[in-house]
């Protein structure tokens, strides 16, 4: 067809063909007219089977580009408007928006650092876990040192003013199973003395040696785990009295008092520690053995049992967040945080098909101005 003088656009194909309307192009290449118009509006071109179709202007009669003969001419003004819109898009320049950094007003910053499931005297031979992990007393010491150094880095970076250091138990493995009596690298008492020295050294580092000018307050929460018990079964009313960890926490507290290390201690005579934060939040800390083993064997993993525990506690305590350990897996939900472990993968995890996880501990930073969590970090210990 001949070009219409009132229709000064053409579609030029990369194969040399020329089309004078979207309808003509659609009929010639058997494509949907709406799709072609949309691509012209959004991209300024249309592509099919390796051929690119581009909008151009008709200059004059001397244009020698091959014209495809189309029997049907443009019969409505709408198609002409489609050309104009598509052409307009291709000719518009980019608009540059100015971006200006701004500083958010900040409130009182406090962080919860979880410390649990170190099992420092337990032995993990690489061969027993297909070389996914190795663990012994020396590696445990190294990982705990790394934890405190990395924790100090987080506190400095986040300008934290108050630290809630929550030791959630199972720092030692103890002798609760015959297998542990045969394979542990230390007795429970030896492991307790080793663990209390490592934890005290880490707290001392945070208070005196790390460069943390913003950190004004440290609150220590000490929860006993199930591995540190001296009884065959867990005892609920007086379990703390029969735990190596409760003795360990008392020793750490006394040493801090003797050396004037400014740390507030809360060592409950209960399975739970319930504290209030500066912005009136209620936090519950527990080891996690309150969730029975059935909570990890389902398709949904720990989540159903964890949510049930959260709901049960909420009826009584109206807590904002529950923090637990025990499961050696980092889990975060809107109402609960499950800590990872320092020991990482062992033969028990392999036998039960648990997911592998690097040695890590949870760290959650809060800002009173925001009214909730500012950020969550994983503190890696390896």
Which residues fall in each region the model found?
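Conserved beta-sheet core of the metallophosphoesterase superfamily
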Residues: 238-246, 253-262, 267-271, 279-381
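Short Lys/Arg-enriched helix C-cap and helix-to-coil transition segments
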Residues: 44-63
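Short alpha-helical "recognition helix" segments of helix-turn-helix
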Residues: 24-26
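Short, amphipathic alpha-helical "recognition" segments used to contact nucleic acids or chromatin
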Residues: 3-20
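Active-site neighborhood of divalent metal-dependent phosphoester bond hydrolases
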Residues: 118, 127-129, 135-137, 174-266
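N-terminal active-site segment of His-dependent metallophosphoesterases
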Residues: 61-200
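Major-groove recognition helix of helix-turn-helix-like DNA-binding domains
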Residues: 32-44
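Divalent metal-coordination and catalytic microenvironments
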Residues: 117, 170, 199, 225, ...
């Amino acid at each position: 067809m001949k070009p219409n003088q009132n229709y000064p656009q053409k579609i030029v194909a990369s194969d040399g063909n020329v089309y004078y309307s979207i309808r003509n192009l659609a009929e010639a290449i058997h494509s949907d007219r709406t799709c072609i118009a949309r691509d012209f509006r959004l991209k300024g071109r249309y592509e099919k089977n390796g051929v690119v179709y581009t909008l151009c202007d008709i200059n004059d009669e001397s244009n020698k580009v091959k014209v495809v003969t189309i029997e049907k001419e443009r019969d409505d003004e709408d198609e002409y408007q489609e050309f104009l819109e598509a052409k307009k898009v291709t000719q518009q320049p980019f608009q540059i928006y100015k971006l200006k950094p701004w500083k958010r007003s900040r409130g009182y910053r406090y962080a919860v650092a979880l410390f649990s499931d170190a099992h420092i005297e337990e032995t993990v031979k690489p061969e027993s876990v297909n070389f996914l992990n190795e663990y012994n007393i020396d590696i445990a010491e190294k990982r705990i040192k790394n934890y405190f150094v990395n924790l100090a880095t987080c506190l400095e970076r986040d300008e934290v003013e108050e630290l809630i250091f929550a030791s959630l138990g199972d720092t030692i493995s103890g002798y609760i199973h015959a297998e542990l009596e045969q394979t542990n690298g230390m007795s429970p008492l030896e492991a307790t003395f080793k663990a209390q020295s490592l934890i005290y050294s880490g707290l001392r580092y945070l208070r005196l040696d790390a460069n943390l000018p913003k950190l004004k307050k440290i609150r220590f929460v000490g929860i006993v785990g199930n591995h540190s018990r001296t009884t065959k079964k867990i005892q609920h009313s007086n379990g703390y009295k029969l735990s190596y960890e409760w003795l360990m926490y008392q020793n750490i507290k006394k040493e801090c008092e003797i050396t004037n290390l400014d740390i507030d201690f809360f060592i409950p005579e209960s399975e739970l520690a319930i504290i209030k934060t500066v912005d009136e939040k209620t936090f519950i800390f527990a080891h996690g053995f309150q969730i029975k083993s059935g909570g990890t064997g389902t398709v949904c993993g720990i989540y159903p049992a964890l949510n049930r525990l959260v709901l049960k506690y909420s009826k009584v305590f109206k807590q904002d967040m529950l923090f637990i350990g025990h499961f050696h897996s980092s889990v975060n939900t809107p109402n609960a945080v499950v800590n990872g472990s320092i020991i990482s993968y062992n033969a028990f995890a392999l036998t039960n098909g648990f997911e592998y996880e690097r040695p890590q501990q949870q760290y959650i930073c809060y800002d009173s101005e925001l009214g909730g969590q500012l950020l969550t970090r994983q503190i890696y210990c390896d």
